[in-house]
Amino acid sequence: QRALQYAGTFGYTVWLRPQDAWLGKGVAASGPLATRMGLSGIPVAAELIALHTIFELVRSTRARVHLCRISSAAGIELVRQAKAEGLPVTCDVSVHNLHLIDVDLGYFDSRTRLSPPLRQQRDREALRAALADGTIDALVSDHTPVDEDAKVLPFAEAEVGATALELLLSLAVRWAQADGVGMQRALATVTHGPASVLGHSLGTLSASAGRLVEGGVADLCILDAEAWW
């Protein structure tokens, strides 16, 4: 609470990953699949408890908080309610949780050992809808490179993380095409959305970051939306 009070005093945004440390000790999302595979689960409650705690602290301190990597349908519903209440909160979702679900663990594929874990299809659908309607402010790569030796291990022993920076833009476009989301909204989730979350922390770039404005920095990326690689 004191950290949020200090941050609020100086106008800083606090970045938090909403996951209860005790309930989040598992290695896969709780559910029938994790049970069948004999993997310790991370329940949705791990995210919900953390979100409730964070929102109560935001109510008392009025500090701005950014929630990193929301992963569940119930979690994004709490975020939607918090925003409707007027709490100064923003959030993002990773490309992993936007495109994959728990069945993509395959036969203990340690490349899918991620945090937050891949959840059920209903969670993915809720996240995709929330990104489309603006409840989720940004799409992130959650780029966490892991040494190959740390991944070629039994699933529960493998290190958490995966590379994704090189896939962020293409997966944003793929999501837009699959869900009928306009290209402008899709690109905003990886440009203007993240820049808005960062705000004044971008310094002199804050006036033009993530968008094209006269006199702004010409930070451009050219892509072929029809190309495959």
Which sequence ranges carry the predicted segments?
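A residue-identity detector for tryptophan
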Residues: 15, 22, 175, 228-229
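A generic structural micro-environment signature
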Residues: 73-76, 104-106, 120, 124, ...
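Histidine/acidic residue-rich metal-binding segments in metalloenzymes
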Residues: 1-139
